[in-house]
């Protein structure tokens, strides 16, 4: 039954979507004493908790444990009859996701955020209609609305997913069996992580990336190191290439591989994972009714996450830019502070850390050397290999390095780039250094615990100082 306009529930803030941006916005607004409603049509936590960050990392951990167990004798451990159980890995992954989702539910309840289940449609700049799964409807009005609906996999014409032969990252998280072979279209973060997981699980994997290298937004040296590492474990990497004709049969997928300056080549696999980016979840949201402008599949906003409609904000993936959960969380705080009448500091995208969780893992923050030079900086660069680290040697994980980029004139850090086992865990220090302009001397003068991988950061800073002559 449709409620009348006069019976609409009243809130200070309504949040549409419960991913890292949405639930953080709701919690932050509640801490400000605002009456908050959060609307979610699926599981609390959004894609990140249920079909993205969290379950992916759980699967990657399973593959990492399996990989370590395949070579245990060096560590004095004897293992026999080793095998990889994908069903159990998926089961654990789903359990981890469910626990995280329940955690979000607990936090919202504790903060007295009212959660409405259903599909939200904007009915104006202040109104939202929510349709529950059973078809029942109710309405709310809010002084401010935050749209945090996230994003969904981009579909390429001719590569429409069928959930079996052509899949997205969502299906890749719950496959029943390890495919004999897999073509991964896209060498970004999702493609790289899924390629590594399924290769370690036993599939023969080929990555096809249109750009000249894997992780094209990252430091070139890091991308090349990752490619070499992947090729050592028999992952075929085809960069500067695209797919031509794609055919599906009962046996799998075959396609023409097209690379500039090379003859077309036939490739085939049991299935194909398409991971070529995402587009904002905006269809059916009622953006026109609210007067909200979009651009290339995302909601257009200013630096404080304000849309073209007064009182409506957009945060996270639906806003575009870097598609990262922690960026969404940071934008949640910005939007709520703006609603509260504060003057929040706009987010600087270069200072947002980027992480890729294959092994070796990749992490970066700030400018690459190339970008810094292009921006007009004179740079000072320092590098240090993890192979020189006592901790890395003790763990038998020698791959990778740290590369730091400094402003040669001021000495302040401009960017930090890492590749190595669990290198992502070091990015916090580098993010802090970039944000506050820490110098190479400052990093060297900071005592780093021994033995830790973080000592490699200090050694890279020391190398930069030595290069000054």
From Swiss-Prot:
One of its GO terms (molecular function) is flavin adenine dinucleotide binding. InterPro entries: Class-I_Pyr_Nuc-Dis_Oxidored (IPR050151), FAD/NAD-bd_sf (IPR036188), FAD/NAD-binding_dom (IPR023753), FAD/NAD-linked_Rdtase_dimer_sf (IPR016156), Lipoamide_DH (IPR006258), Pyr_nuc-diS_OxRdtase (IPR001100), Pyr_nucl-diS_OxRdtase_dimer (IPR004099), Pyr_OxRdtase_I_AS (IPR012999). It catalyses: N(6)-[(R)-dihydrolipoyl]-L-lysyl-[protein] + NAD(+) = N(6)-[(R)-lipoyl]-L-lysyl-[protein] + NADH + H(+). Its main location: cytoplasm. Its EC number is 1.8.1.4. GO terms for biological process: 2-oxoglutarate metabolic process. Keywords: Cytoplasm, Disulfide bond, FAD, Flavoprotein, NAD, Oxidoreductase, Redox-active center. Disulfide bonds join 48-53. Its cofactor is FAD. It is found in: Cytoplasm. Lipoamide dehydrogenase is a component of the alpha-ketoacid dehydrogenase complexes. Belongs to the class-I pyridine nucleotide-disulfide oxidoreductase family. This is Dihydrolipoyl dehydrogenase.
């Amino acid at each position: 039954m449709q409620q009348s306009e006069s019976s609409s529930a009243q809130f200070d803030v309504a949040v549409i979507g419960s991913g890292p941006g949405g639930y953080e916005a709701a919690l932050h607004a509640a801490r400000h004493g605002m009456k908050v409603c959060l609307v979610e049509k699926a599981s609390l936590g959004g894609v990140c908790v249920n079909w993205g960050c969290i379950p992916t990392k759980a699967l990657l951990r399973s593959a990492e444990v399996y990989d370590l167990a395949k070579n245990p004798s060096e560590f004095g451990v004897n293992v026999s009859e080793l095998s990889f159980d994908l069903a159990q890995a998926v089961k654990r992954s789903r359990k981890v996701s469910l626990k995280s989702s329940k955690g979000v539910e607990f936090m919202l309840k504790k903060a007295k955020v009212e959660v409405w289940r259903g599909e939200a449609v904007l009915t104006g700049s202040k109104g939202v209609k929510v349709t529950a799964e059973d078809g029942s409807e109710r309405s709310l009005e809010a002084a401010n609305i935050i749209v945090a609906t996230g994003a969904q996999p981009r579909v390429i014409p001719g590569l429409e997913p069928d959930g079996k032969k052509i899949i997205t990252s969502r299906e890749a998280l719950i496959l029943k069996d390890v495919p004999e072979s897999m073509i991964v279209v896209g060498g970004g973060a999702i493609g790289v992580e899924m390629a590594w997981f399924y290769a370690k699980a036993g599939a023969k994997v080929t990555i096809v990336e249109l750009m000249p290298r894997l992780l094209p937004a990252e430091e070139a040296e890091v991308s090349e190191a990752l490619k070499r590492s992947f090729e050592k474990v028999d992952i075929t990497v085809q960069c500067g290439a695209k797919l031509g004709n794609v055919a599906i049969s009962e046996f799998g997928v075959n396609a023409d591989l097209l690379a500039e300056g090379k003859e077309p080549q036939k490739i085939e696999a049991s299935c194909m994972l398409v991971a070529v980016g995402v587009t904002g979840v905006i269809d059916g949201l009622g953006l026109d009714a609210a007067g909200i402008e979009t651009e290339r599949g995302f909601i257009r906003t200013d630096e404080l996450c304000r849309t073209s409609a007064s009182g409506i904000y957009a945060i996270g993936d639906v806003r575009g830019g870097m598609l990262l959960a922690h960026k969404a969380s940071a934008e949640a705080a910005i939007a709520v502070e703006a609603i509260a009448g504060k003057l929040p500091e706009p987010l600087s995208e270069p200072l947002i850390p980027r992480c890729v969780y294959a092994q070796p893992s990749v992490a970066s923050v700030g400018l690459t050397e190339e970008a810094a030079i292009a921006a007009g900086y004179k740079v000072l660069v320092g590098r240090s290999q993890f192979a020189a680290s006592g901790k890395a040697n003790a763990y038998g994980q020698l791959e990778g390095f740290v590369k730091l980029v400094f402003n040669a004139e001021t000495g302040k850090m401009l960017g930090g780039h890492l590749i190595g086992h669990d290198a992502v865990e070091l990015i916090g220090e580098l993010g802090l250094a970039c944000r506050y302009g820490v110098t190479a001397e400052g990093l060297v003068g900071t005592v780093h615990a021994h033995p830790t991988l973080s000592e490699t950061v200090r050694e890279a800073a020391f190398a930069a100082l030595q290069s000054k002559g």
